[in-house]
Swiss-Prot record:
This is ATP-dependent protease ATPase subunit HslU. It is found in: Cytoplasm. Pfam families: AAA, AAA_2. A double ring-shaped homohexamer of HslV is capped on each side by a ring-shaped HslU homohexamer. The assembly of the HslU/HslV complex is dependent on binding of ATP. It comes from Paraburkholderia phymatum (strain DSM 17167 / CIP 108236 / LMG 21445 / STM815). ATPase subunit of a proteasome-like degradation complex; this subunit has chaperone activity. The binding of ATP and its subsequent hydrolysis by HslU are essential for unfolding of protein substrates subsequently hydrolyzed by HslV. HslU recognizes the N-terminal part of its protein substrates and unfolds these before they are guided to HslV for hydrolysis. Its main location: cytoplasm. GO terms for cellular component: HslUV protease complex. ATP binds at I18, G60, V61, G62, K63, T64, E65, D260, E325, R397. Keywords: ATP-binding, Chaperone, Cytoplasm, Nucleotide-binding, Stress response. InterPro entries: AAA+_ATPase (IPR003593), ATP-dep_Clp_protease_ClpX (IPR050052), ATPase_AAA_core (IPR003959), Clp_ATPase_C (IPR019489), HslU (IPR004491), P-loop_NTPase (IPR027417).
């Protein structure tokens, strides 16, 4: 669990997301409250439940990214789900309980990887021993008894240590060896009707277990063999029951569910009878968000302390169009701002993995040096903002389209620019994009 303070969390989020300070503060406090709750003694700790968050704002302003980065910081099981994927119980389609089942699968995978990392050093030693046994057959079985055999044993032990040193230095990486590796059962793609994902998953697991334990002899290079055997040894040391228990506990205490497009299941007051199943999905979500127990293949999972973050643009519906009971389950409401020209400029250059840095790195692989002038960045931001205003506002995602169109020619003919620098200034941007940006009909299709 993360022990970062709210200020530290916001500072980390600032490296990847521009603006939206109110939303960042809300999620930072929610994450910190999880740590605070763990410091509280029982039975009061059990009574403290997370305050779920409703983010309201247009598409492309950072709603999903805030939740995704938060989960990464917390190292917590995280799932992003579109609310529109679900149907009311009794209708054909997925029911909301599958959210928790998917989340527990993610948690099991995370927990398994964490536990395997802890055992990595010991597993690597065992893998090295197995490789040395193949490279030096009989070295371990030499001599107990006579003085000659003892001397021979010392000699073989010295040889073994020499080979181990060379193995660790990478001197044997390209040598080919034969070894027996546990076969992975081929993944079977079983098609099932909507809403029956659990049954198809169980059938898939059953077929996967049928092929388990079989070994196959393969000829591989030492470097690859070391990796394969390390993974195999680490898997052997894992206690599956312990992994399941930790995974369930991790979901119950630290799980984060991001419910996107929640406004699409809000029933507008003037709408007709077609809204029934939307209301049904909202009612099905109620116990999940409030706290219930879901039966999964890893055991019963309580949702009382899972943090739910819902988001929606609410263009056509309003938060008050959600059924009152569900509104009450999301006490913290945060409105995200639309992006300005200044925000677009910052997104292009100020974040840790900004678009400008990404394209510079991509073209640098072909020895093409992209240089962005300040006026070029400014003009790019202005065009992206302008196209958003004139057509559909898709937020920061517009920058992907604009910059891709801008660098289309350079990317295509990168081989002709090898060893050269390409300066992207305002004049270059205007030459590449002005015609498209000015023509509203054309920008609808191109940008």
């Amino acid at each position: 669990m993360s022990t970062m303070t709210p200020a530290e969390i916001v500072s980390e989020l600032d490296k990847h997301i521009i603006g939206q300070n109110r939303a960042k503060k809300a999620v930072a406090v929610a994450l910190r409250n999880r740590w605070r709750r763990q410091q509280v003694d029982e039975p009061l700790r059990q009574e403290i439940t997370p305050k779920n968050i409703l983010m309201i704002g247009p598409t492309g302003v950072g709603k999903t990214e805030i939740a995704r980065r938060l989960a990464k910081l917390a190292d917590a099981p995280f799932i992003k789900i579109e609310a529109t994927k679900f149907t009311e119980v009794g209708y054909v389609g997925r029911d909301v309980d599958s959210i928790v089942r998917d989340l527990i699968e993610i948690s099991v995978k995370q927990t398994r990887e964490t536990e395997m990392r802890k055992m990595r050093t010991k597993a690597e030693d065992l893998a090295e021993d197995r490789i040395l046994d193949i490279l030096l057959p009989g070295a371990r079985t030499v001599g107990f008894g006579s003085g000659t055999s003892e001397a021979s044993g010392d000699e073989s032990n010295t040889t073994r240590q020499t080979f181990r040193k060379r193995l660790r230095e990478g001197a044997l990486d390209d040598k080919e060896i034969e070894l027996d590796i546990e076969m992975q059962a081929p993944a079977m793609d079983i098609m099932g009707p909507p809403g029956m994902e659990d049954m198809t998953e169980q059938i898939r697991s059953m077929f996967a277990n049928l092929g388990g334990g079989k070994k196959t002899r393969r000829k591989v290079k030492v470097k690859e063999a070391l990796k394969l055997l390390t993974d195999e040894e680490a898997s052997k040391m894992l206690n599956d029951e312990e992994v399941k228990t930790k995974a369930v506990q991790n979901v119950e205490q630290n799980g984060i569910v991001f419910l996107d497009e929640i406004d699409k299941i809000a029933s507008r007051s003037e709408a007709g009878g077609g809204e029934v199943s939307r209301q049904g999905v909202q009612r099905d979500l109620l116990p999940l968000v409030e706290g219930t127990t879901i039966n999964t293949k890893y055991g019963m999972v309580k949702t009382d302390h899972i943090l739910f973050i819902a988001s929606g643009a609410f263009h056509l519906a309003k938060p008050s169009d959600l059924i009152p009971e569900l509104q009450g389950r999301f006490p913290i409401r945060v409105e995200l701002d639309s992006l300005s020209v200044k925000d677009f400029e910052s997104i292009l250059v100020a974040t840790d993995a900004s678009l400008v840095k990404q394209y510079q790195a991509l073209l640098a692989t072909e020895d093409v040096h992209l240089e962005f002038a300040d006026d070029g960045i400014r003009r790019l931001a202005e065009i992206a903002f302008s196209v958003n205003e004139k057509t559909e506002n898709i937020g920061a995602r517009r920058l992907y389209t604009v910059i891709e169109k801008l660098l289309e020619e350079v990317s295509f003919s990168a081989g002709n620019h090898t060893g050269k620098s390409v300066l992207i200034d305002a004049a270059y941007v205007d030459r590449a994009l002005n015609d498209v940006a000015q023509d509203e009909d054309l920008s609808r299709y191109v940008l």
